């Protein structure tokens, strides 16, 4: 679990977002360390709790709220030989040219080389004439 700040309109439990890095106004903000310093660029986060504290913000239409976030489970296509629920693997993205499957082939929030735990196998999928599995995974170093 990580403490960070998000715009007041976004501050609802269950909301997911991708952190792309600090915006220009953030670089001179006194809250930048709490707001952006705890997040990793390119990662997906899910708000699990909204706290009652709020602060002024130049970027988020006036206010940000203190929230608790986690990296959520993410669906990704993997090789069938690695598809064992409960196992840990080093993520390697499969070769797939189908633009409709890009969100499963290279999902935002995961990077090739991440160590992930396979939570469950969701189903089968085919691409480029090959059969793969869709797995729900979570980055292993987020499991505390």
UniProtKB/Swiss-Prot annotation:
Q: Which Pfam families match?
A: UPF0179
Where are the membrane-spanning stretches?
none
Tell me the superkingdom of the source.
Archaea
Q: Which family does it belong to?
A: Belongs to the UPF0179 family.
Checking HAMAP family in the record gives: UPF0179
Return the protein name: UPF0179 protein PF1381
């Amino acid at each position: 679990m990580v403490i960070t700040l998000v715009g007041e309109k976004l501050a609802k439990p269950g909301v997911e977002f991708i952190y792309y890095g600090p915006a220009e106004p953030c670089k001179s903000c006194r809250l930048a360390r709490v707001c952006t310093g705890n997040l990793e660029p390119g990662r997906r986060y899910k708000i699990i709790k909204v706290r009652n504290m709020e602060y002024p913000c130049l970027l988020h239409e006036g206010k940000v709220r203190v929230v608790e976030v986690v990296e959520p489970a993410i669906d990704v296509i993997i090789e069938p030989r690695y598809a064992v629920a409960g196992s840990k693997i080093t993520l390697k993205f499969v070769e797939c040219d189908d633009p409709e499957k890009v969100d499963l082939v290279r999902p935002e929030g995961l990077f090739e080389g991440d160590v992930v735990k396979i939570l469950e196998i969701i189903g089968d999928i085919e691409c480029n004439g090959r059969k793969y599995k869709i797995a729900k995974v979570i980055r292993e170093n987020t499991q505390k």
